[in-house]
């Protein structure tokens, strides 16, 4: 992955003056990046995870991988259906969203179609980013992620 030299620039906002001008005119600019939570299940049960706190709808859906697999099979409402994800990705690409970040509420890679969703993101010309605990990597996923912008592994998970 190639690192953008301006990624940590204190003047990062200046790189997006067109968006600032849209705000000034009262317009709603298209987001540069969209975060997509495709699953609110996780194969870990980290005591420090904010999503486990009381009040979160997903706080009872964290645990051992076998239990999570059972929840996936018994409760498909715990993740966005594949077809809906494709629709969201297509809409984002059509609007001109630059990057798609697959992130938490759970572990994105427990979604049975995460590999296809990551590839579809790249095929649509958007940058791919992922926040993961890195423990559910299906065959071919590392090669897809190598084409992405960044991957953040939660090493404390």
Residue ranges and their predicted role:
Residues 1-73, 90-93:
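N-terminal pre-core extensions flanking Radical SAM catalytic domains
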Residues 77-105, 110-157:
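Radical SAM/AdoMet-radical enzyme domain recognition
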